[in-house]
Amino acid sequence: MDDIRVLIVDDEPDIRATVAEMLEIEGYSTEEAANGADALAAIERRQPDLILLDMRMPVLDGWGFAAEMSRREMAIPIVVMTAARDAARWASEIAATASLSKPFGFDDLIRTVNEVRGAA
């Protein structure tokens, strides 16, 4: 990859680490954030090419994060990743590009990220 940066936003450290490892195998650069507030700070430091976003997190959840991104007029593709059955609906609510239902495997993750990057 030409240094394509993916920001992984999830309150579960094991999920962040596993997703980062899978993406790095495929050549993506990753950064991790434990909640929406940490993600906004990470974006201020260096804007990613894509965001993988959990919806249910403490401090600032996925909805609040997406609202703040919209308020700041930041157009970074977002993939919602959640264990809830409503992943696709939630993705639609926040105008995300795609969704992944947890648990997801390597192939689903890489296919979704590649599709979103191809559409960007």
Segment roles from a protein language model:
Residues 64, 85-101, 107, 111:
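Alpha4 helix (beta4-alpha4-beta5 surface) of REC/receiver domains from two-component response regulators
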Residues 79-82:
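Hydrophobic/aromatic residues positioned on beta-strands within the core alpha/beta folds
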Residues 41, 63-74:
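Short amphipathic alpha-helix used as the core "switch/output" element in two-component signaling
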Residues 54:
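Active-site residues of response regulator receiver
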Residues 1-7, 13, 107-120:
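Non-catalytic signal-transmission and effector/linker regions of two-component phosphorelay proteins
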Residues 13-31:
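Two-component/phosphorelay signaling modules centered on CheY-like receiver
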Residues 57:
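Receiver (REC) domain active-site loop signature in two-component systems and cognate sites
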Residues 34-38, 60-64:
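Acidic catalytic/metal-coordinating carboxylates
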